[in-house]
Amino acid sequence: MPGEQKKVCIDVPYIDQSKLYPTGCESVSTVMLLRFLGIDITVDEFIEKYLEKKSFEERDGQVYGPDPHRYFCGSPYDDESFGCYAPVIREALEKIIGAEYTVTDETGMTTDELVEKYIDQGMPVIYWACINMRDPILYR
């Protein structure tokens, strides 16, 4: 029927991050995607072997963190960590899959565009969002 929306359900293996990886949503989502592609890897293996991580530093009573575009800030095992952005995960994925697949950073693409280009075609995506899909807080 015209105007009817189709539903696409992609059978991606679920991994619960809540107990072991409180700030590891990027890592857990990446491993879920890799398992969907048939690559047998654990979340711990991904974090320890492939994820670029850097700790926070304290200087003169101030805490400084690394660039989240280059590193996971802190540790996915620590509930006080910050996380990372798409370039860090893209680089980790490229180390694992090599030339077998193409990894594309689609930062800035709308949800509808991601659905049409990937999910409707049966390909899962790794999606960055704020808790409860609220708008991000931007600092200048």
Question: What residues fall within each predicted segment?
Answer:
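Active-site-adjacent substructure of cysteine-protease-like catalytic cores
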Residues: T107-R140
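A local structural micro-motif
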Residues: T42, Y101-T102, I126
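Short, well-structured beta-strand/strand-turn elements
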Residues: A99-M109
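Short helix-loop-beta junction
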Residues: A92-A99
